[in-house]
């Protein structure tokens, strides 16, 4: 278990680890207790009542946060023909076809999101073993395999995030920065939770939304009362 620094320990003392805080109170605590000098990311960890070992209990998708994440995301688009121009006009940072595949095979990875047109997926499939483990493989479920390139790029630039349940049944997602007004963090969190509820697998049994913890990059976790989201 990693040893925490003095600032973290002092911040953690101000959080009741047994208490489930109301949403706004929890987010205000996270902002107040963020110990680092840089603008830390605020993240939500959501525990879901699913068994990810079963294919019919996977939770995966994407959602546009109304206030974005506070981070400028670098977008790579795999495209050819007129779609190259469309991607460039939409604000994609890198656009290309087979040459981009070769570049990634050579070790280049300077992007946060990859989008591809369907006719490029056979080429992109060659680097699936590189992109997949990093969560960068374009996928129709997250809207990153599409011919509507302009919309896909615009959504990512506007604050679209992807989410995917891990082996323990948790979703980890950024919801902003500690510099955000608490109302904006709250709206982003609500948008994320609403998306997760809509994505509930039919095979999921029992309580679905089992817990929410919000934290900053370097700060302690604060438990959130889930009643507001399931009421």
UniProtKB/Swiss-Prot annotation:
User: Keyword Ribonucleoprotein, does the record have it?
Assistant: yes
Q: Which GO terms describe its cellular component?
A: large ribosomal subunit
Sorted alphabetically, the keyword list is: Repressor, Ribonucleoprotein, Ribosomal protein, RNA-binding, rRNA-binding, Translation regulation, tRNA-binding
* PROSITE patterns named in the record: RIBOSOMAL_L1 (PS01199)
Q: Name one GO molecular function term.
A: rRNA binding
| Single Gene Ontology BP annotation | translation
Its quaternary structure?
Part of the 50S ribosomal subunit.
Q: What does this protein do?
A: Binds directly to 23S rRNA. The L1 stalk is quite mobile in the ribosome, and is involved in E site tRNA release.
HAMAP family according to UniProt: Ribosomal_uL1_B
Similarity field? Belongs to the universal ribosomal protein uL1 family.
Task: Give the protein name, as stated in the record.
Answer: Large ribosomal subunit protein uL1
Q: Which organism is it from?
A: Desulforudis audaxviator (strain MP104C)
């Amino acid at each position: 278990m990693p040893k925490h620094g003095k600032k973290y320990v002092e911040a953690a003392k101000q959080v009741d680890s047994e208490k489930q805080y109301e949403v706004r109170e929890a987010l205000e605590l996270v902002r107040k207790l963020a110990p680092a000098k840089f603008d830390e990311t605020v993240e939500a960890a959501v525990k879901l009542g699913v068994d990810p070992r079963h294919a019919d209990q996977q939770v995966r998708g994407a959602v546009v946060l109304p206030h974005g994440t506070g981070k400028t995301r670098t977008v790579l688009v795999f495209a050819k023909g007129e779609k190259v121009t469309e991607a460039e006009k939409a604000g994609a940072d890198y656009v290309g076809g087979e040459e981009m595949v070769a570049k990634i095979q050579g070790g280049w990875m300077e992007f946060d999101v990859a989008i591809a047109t369907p006719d490029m997926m056979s080429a992109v499939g060659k680097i699936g073993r590189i992109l997949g483990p990093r969560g960068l493989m374009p996928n129709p479920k997250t809207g990153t395999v599409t011919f509507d390139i302009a919309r896909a790029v615009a959504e990512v630039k506007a604050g679209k995030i992807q989410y995917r349940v891990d082996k323990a049944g948790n979703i980890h997602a950024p919801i902003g920065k500690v510099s955000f007004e608490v109302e904006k963090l709250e709206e982003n969190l609500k948008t994320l939770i609403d998306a997760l509820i809509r994505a509930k697998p039919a095979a999921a049994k029992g309580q679905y939304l089992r817990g929410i913890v919000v934290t900053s990059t370097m700060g302690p976790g604060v438990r959130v009362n889930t009643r507001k989201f399931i009421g």
